[in-house]
Amino acid sequence: MLNNILQFLKERELYSQANFETELDNHLKEKKNNFYVGFDPTANSLHIGNYVLIHIAKLLKDMGHTPHIVLGSATALIGDPTGRIELRKILEEKEIVKNTKTIKKQIKQFLGDVIIHENKVWLEKLNYIEVIRELGAFFSVNKMLSTDAFSARWEKGLTLMELNYMILQAYDFYYLHKNHNVTLQIGGSDQWANILAGANLIKRKNNASVFGLTANLLVKANGEKMGKTSSGALWLDENKTSVFDFYQYWINLDDQSLKKTFLMLTMLDKKVIDELCNLKGPKIKQTKQMLAFLITELIHGTKKAKEAQQRSELIFSNQPDLDIKLVKTSTNLIDYLVETKFIKSKSEARRLISQKGLTINNKHVLDLNQIIEWKEELQIIRKGKKSFLTIKTVNS
């Protein structure tokens, strides 16, 4: 069991900042506490960036602290403007209800039997006059506008609706502290201003000191957010990002980002990580395979991780060096294969498909009218056991 969680988070490059760091360190060592992590259900799945916070919540839970997970079923109706240039898409309430239901299942999958709240339970009880009178007096608009949470939107035209987001999230912390003795909020580093707003509200209304802790965002070595794919994000739901595509994302990760990803997302010993990340040339493939397997296992379980690993090796190992062909999306598959002389005739192509003798990335082609779909990764078209064609799709 960990004895010094803050030190561990720093060693694993998870720690960004905390208010009253020394006091928080003692607070977590001296007794078991209630803490909370929040997620707005703006999609029907969590993504890999969210998993960083789940990972930290699990570490604290294993130390004996009690997690309270807050799903923003009310705040999702407004949308967090933090770091955004454009106004968020306004979601229908029925969509948020559906998203909340699926995310609850994911939370339980990763954290087990934990306390899950929906903030509409308390936020819907507030009336507007009460918000302005009882909460608004504790917020300086000048200070709010100076934070990173609003600066990007300010240039484009910040709405009153968005301005209220910080107040409502601060009230979440206030409510949980008052009713559940929650003394710590954990969020991504982009949530620092919102977390401090909640801590300050509690201090001014209740004269109590609470803590905020932020985690580093999961980014590549070049600063780009990790997890961007052709589907928009690296989703934890296999129906949105297949287990194979999830596995392959880590296989294709740039070499410079490997060590940080190992540290942030796995519990592998640091010495082992150093050894793996010091491998050079073709041997670095072993490092990527280890990373891909460990993270896929965390999210999807050992069985599916092994299946993805085996499929990846089957598709990509021992292949001859082939030219990568650029293909426009929406191209008819049979027409393309005949044009490139990969298959002699359309009749042969139809026969291969009917006999399940043609695959794309190890998936049988079953539709005689199949078109070539856009994929971020390379696609390996296999005819029989030994004939391959490697393609990369480009938008028409």
Swiss-Prot record:
The keyword RNA-binding applies. GO terms for molecular function: ATP binding; RNA binding; tyrosine-tRNA ligase activity. It is an enzyme of class 6 (ligase). ATP binds at K228. It comes from the Bacteria. It catalyses: tRNA(Tyr) + L-tyrosine + ATP = L-tyrosyl-tRNA(Tyr) + AMP + diphosphate + H(+). A motif ('KMSKS' region) lies at residues 225-229. L-tyrosine binds at Y36, Y165, Q169. NCBIfam families: tyrS (TIGR00234). Belongs to the class-I aminoacyl-tRNA synthetase family. TyrS type 1 subfamily. HAMAP family: Tyr_tRNA_synth_type1. Homodimer. This is Tyrosine--tRNA ligase. It comes from Mycoplasma genitalium (strain ATCC 33530 / DSM 19775 / NCTC 10195 / G37). The gene is tyrS.
